[in-house]
Amino acid sequence: MIVGHGIDLQEIEAITKAYERNQRFAERVLTEQELLLFKGISNPKRQMSFLTGRWAAKEAYSKALGTGIGKVNFHDIEILSDDKGAPLITKEPFNGKSFVSISHSGNYAQASVILEEEK
């Protein structure tokens, strides 16, 4: 049974500006594993797209939980990739199944998270 659904849309340029003001912004949003992936991306635009996608996914996750960021921290949620490259939530505070989708189009990243109670 679905117990939560969250969606977030984020402008890549806004996250890029936040990162340019303070590069520690990435450390605030990303876990150690996510940060390794981020630093391994050589193309700056692709790097910002990755960071924005993870931001949007974590915001969507917090909305699906019904708490928003604050009650749950960015580092409480980790999104890596499965063997096919699709995003996969690998660390989370929810005790059930979780599903995430991240899309990029133009100057935007969008994410959707569904939380499902296990029977």
Swiss-Prot record:
Residues in coiled coil = none
Kindly list the GO molecular function terms attached to this UniProt entry.
Answer: holo-[acyl-carrier-protein] synthase activity; magnesium ion binding
In terms of domain of life, where is this protein from? Bacteria
Note whether Nucleotidyltransferase occurs among the keywords.
no
The record lists the catalysed reaction(s) as:
apo-[ACP] + CoA = holo-[ACP] + adenosine 3',5'-bisphosphate + H(+)
Cofactor(s) recorded in Swiss-Prot or TrEMBL: Mg(2+)
List the InterPro entries: 4-PPantetheinyl_Trfase_dom (IPR008278), 4-PPantetheinyl_Trfase_dom_sf (IPR037143), ACPS (IPR002582), Ppantetheine-prot_Trfase_dom (IPR004568)
- Which Cys residues form disulphide pairs? none
Q: Which UniProt keywords apply?
A: Cytoplasm, Fatty acid biosynthesis, Fatty acid metabolism, Lipid biosynthesis, Lipid metabolism, Magnesium, Metal-binding, Transferase
Asked whether the UniProt record includes Cell division among its keywords, one would answer: no
What top-tier enzyme class does this entry carry? transferase
For the ligand (Mg(2+)), the binding residues are: 8, 59
EC number(s) per entry: 2.7.8.7
Any GO BP annotation: fatty acid biosynthetic process
Q: What does this protein do?
A: Transfers the 4'-phosphopantetheine moiety from coenzyme A to a Ser of acyl-carrier-protein.
Kindly provide the name given to this protein in its UniProt entry. Answer: Holo-[acyl-carrier-protein] synthase
Originating organism: Streptococcus agalactiae serotype V (strain ATCC BAA-611 / 2603 V/R)
Q: Which gene codes for it? A: acpS
